[in-house]
Swiss-Prot record:
One of its GO terms (cellular component) is cytoplasm. Its EC number is 2.6.1.-. This is Uncharacterized aminotransferase C27F1.05c. Belongs to the class-III pyridoxal-phosphate-dependent aminotransferase family. It is an enzyme of class 2 (transferase). The modification N6-(pyridoxal phosphate)lysine is found at residue 305. It comes from Schizosaccharomyces pombe (strain 972 / ATCC 24843) (Fission yeast). Its cofactor is pyridoxal 5'-phosphate.
Amino acid sequence: MIDSTSTATATSKTVELNTNGSKTDASSENGTASNYPEGLWCFDEAMKMDPETTVKLQLDHLNKLRTVHGHARNFVKADNSRFVDEKGTEHLDLIGGVGVVTVGNNNQYVWDCLQKCFDAKLYMMGAISYRNLAAAFGRNMALLSPGQKLTRTWTATGGAEANEGVIKLIRLATRYKPNKKKFLSTLNSFHGKTTGAVFLGGKEKWQKYQSPAPFDVDYVPYGDAEALQVALSSGMYRSFIVEPIQGEGGVIVPPPGYLAKARELCTKYDTYLVLDEIQTGCGRTGKFWACEYENIIPDCIAFAKGFSGGLIPFAGYIATEELWNAAYNSLETAFLHTATYQENTLGLAAGVATIDYIVQNDLLSRCRKLGGIMFDRLNKLQTKFPHVMKDVRGRGMIVGIEFYPIPESVQEEFGEYYATPIVNDLADTYHVQVYCSLNNPSVFRFLPPLTIPEADLDEGLSAVESAVAKFDAKVKEAVAAKST
């Protein structure tokens, strides 16, 4: 029987910690760690690490080129829609971890639910055990699914892993259909950066050095129903995977009726319809799933980001009973796709708590309201600077501004697009965080927490207005100087 009041030890030796965090074997002759290198950081010391050491060690041991633009920050605290850096400066979060912190940074309710798991010393691992949180999360996802028809849930730790799971699901489900040989996706799409996911994505930039693709895949223009019909009519495609809104592609919203037409065509040509709702799900657009705006029922939805409140890596997919059974309803295939952290208790707890918080606080309605405020302000800004801002688009609280190229005569000084220098100025001068889209550097995005106070949203939008006006004046001045 486990004594919950005691702590098990691997050996009878006493292990102490130096003040620098390295482990010392007190039973060794010279008092130094014989089994461990010197200089290891313990948790308490790591939490007290000074900013200079933090920067040095991160540049030494992680990907230093990710900070090459010089705008990385040492954020030490986050609460709802605010960050605090090591100097005590507050920063406003209008990107929300690219849609991760749907319920705000460090949501207290989700934290409390996770703490209850720790306090209860719950069993954390094992996808083959029965657990109440797994049952609750699966049931909730089924009830929240379009038409309550996607009743099977598979969980993972990130969006790319979720889409890798989708790839295997579809391949297994179509294994007895010899004419189904390929996947179909859209140009400029993004589905993650693991080897399979980058080839689902229709951007060659992320496929570099990864060829050959591990499966056959073709791409059609996003939002083009006619091109989709031509492709699907060949009868060769296992599935069509599509984002309801292309997030990394530049917050591209397809024409009305596009998803409904995709559903119709996939049914007609015996092709599974998979929606990647990793950026648009969990209430981001004002409905729980973006596809609900067209009242369609896909065969599978990939989810991630906002489903754990940003506190635990958590993702997965939901699928119809028919699709799931075609893939996994036999002992031969049931264990062909498992993962160490599949149905991890903390991920499930965060998922249940996040959904609960969204429902109890009606964040879908709040998203639609605040999204309306964002569009109203940004559309008015576009009318003031029509030569700078090409478009404002999105839905709910996933919003993008597309900018025109900077005049060629001053591109050497400022870069190709207005978006990047404005994003940098927002971070440096106004302490407001937004990001450019990975696949479209002419666009920067807003995905703020759905819990952001209206005052914070107003402050952030005012900063955007000021930054756009300031940079427009700077570019005009530079162009005028060049022409004289």
